[in-house]
């Protein structure tokens, strides 16, 4: 489990740089109406994006409710699909329709199953990802992962979760060590 988690947040085969970037120095991905959240890592500026996969009828795609891809800031800022290994071991998601709820899916990261999330359309018909932050399902907006690459196998120093309370819309934050 720990090994899978390390794979998820380090993806050694794509590390471009060992230079650490403070959280505030990372580029902010361009806004998108379908944006759920994104992940950035201390290893480089490349960003994994998680967007809701909305059909023309304004519902979530039941076969793939979330589209995951890179923005390669460390290269030329181009958009790039995840490769098979990244999709199935590292950054990919498992999702399953929640019975008796319209446009709602539960899921987890394939590499880290300890925290399950919900992807759904809210009352304003906007896609959101609810993720456990401080023990409560909150709207997840971004994730930052601090990675120590000094050893043979990278280790996760800590993970920061940034989001909003679904009811109050106040900022929420959690930092934890996996």
Predicted ranges, named:
Residues 114-178:
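Extracytoplasmic electrostatic interaction patches
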Residues 1-25:
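Bacterial Sec-dependent N-terminal signal peptides
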Residues 1, 20-22, 29, 51, ...:
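Serine/threonine-rich low-complexity intrinsically disordered regions
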Residues 3, 25, 35, 41, ...:
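Arginine residue identity/basic-tract feature
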